């Protein structure tokens, strides 16, 4: 049995986690200030990022009927939505390439299969 409310909360937490993770890893390429501050970056981002993934997995796991693989695929698909958008917005890398768009579409398919397939 699936609890849609828990799945939505889990997905939102996965999106936030991937957003934080993107900034933790890629701020060095966007802003010069971050280039020489790896330890500060890790200390600043690691705890909130880890907590959002931890709670995201918890909510998604229970929301997907205690299925770990289903929760894992939701987290994976969330990364393929956040990464291309943030990379386009902050680094100007083209989001509208066939390969990237297909990966994003496949991510939505994965989420749909996990949520709606009985």
Question: What residue spans do the PLM features occupy?
Answer:
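Polytopic alpha-helical membrane proteins, predominantly small-molecule transporters/carriers
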Residues: 1-118
């Amino acid at each position: 049995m699936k609890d849609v409310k828990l799945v939505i909360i889990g997905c939102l937490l996965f999106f936030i986690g991937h957003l934080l993770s993107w900034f933790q890893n890629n701020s060095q390429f966007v802003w010069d200030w971050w280039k020489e501050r790896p330890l500060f970056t890790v200390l600043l981002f690691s705890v909130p990022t880890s907590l959002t993934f931890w709670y995201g997995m918890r909510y998604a796991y229970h929301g997907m009927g205690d299925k770990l693989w289903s929760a894992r695929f939701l987290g994976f698909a969330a990364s393929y939505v956040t990464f291309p958008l943030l990379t386009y917005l902050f680094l100007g890398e083209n989001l509208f390439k066939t390969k990237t768009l297909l990966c994003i579409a496949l991510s939505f398919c994965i989420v749909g299969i996990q949520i709606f397939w009985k």
